[in-house]
Amino acid sequence: MVNRRCKQWALAVCAVVWMVALLWVSPATAVPLDLNGKFEILTGEVSTHTPGKVKLIEFADFYCPHCHLFDETAVPLLVKEFGNKLEITMVGFPVIRGKLLTAFDMYEQAKLMGKGNEMRTVLFRTIHKDKIDGVLDRSLREALIKEVGLDPKAFEEGMASGKPSKAVENGKRWGERIKVSSTPSILLDGNIKVDGANMTQENVFTVIRSILENDAKK
């Protein structure tokens, strides 16, 4: 009798454990069945989705011409189409060999000082339009820092602190963990990856729009 009760208790406990496990895992991997477009669900990553908004993380290399094109053409179109329903953040992911990480450090420091988007635009322009893709020395950095409206002294002190380089390294590890194979690649709401041949304007718009449309149905 005692053994039977023990077995019943054990089964009940197991059932509760499995229910908790399912409730814990499902928010991280749940994706609406009618989500449109081409994408990959990263089952090991946690969803960061909040109703009515999509968080887009762009993994990009400042020296990558495709990343510059995405920043110059796709980003403005995405902002125009989705407005405040879309939050775009770039994460530096160096893939071009032989380039120093100074541009990535500058971007991270500017982010810390509230001017990340401005610095991103200036760096892409400097490298791809002004054709300055060599060493970003201190005098050039000062001009760019002033252009985005930041204090050069405070900026350089932040650069020397090591925080920007640590942020760059963390971003690189993140990209490697989710197996970013090319730039630009995007991560939507923490666990929906769009990359490679799927990084067409039409497909990116389709996936984002369908996420928001699914929210509207709820």
Question: What residues fall within each predicted segment?
Answer:
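A short alpha-helix capping/helix-coil boundary motif
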Residues: K55-I57, N84-E87, E118-V122, G149-P152, ...
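Solvent-exposed, acidic/flexible segments
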Residues: G52-K53, C67-D71, I96-A103, L112-G116, ...
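Sec/Tat-exported extracytoplasmic proteins
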Residues: Y63, A74, V79-F82, A110-G114, ...
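Extracytoplasmic thiol/disulfide redox context detector
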Residues: V2-R97, K172, R177, E213-K218
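Extracytoplasmic/secreted envelope proteins and their assembly/folding machinery
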Residues: E72-V79, G83, A103-Y107, R120, ...
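C-terminal cap of thioredoxin/glutaredoxin-like
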Residues: N3-R4, V31, K146-K218
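Structural microenvironment flanking redox-active thiols in thiol-disulfide oxidoreductases
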Residues: E81-L112, N117-I145
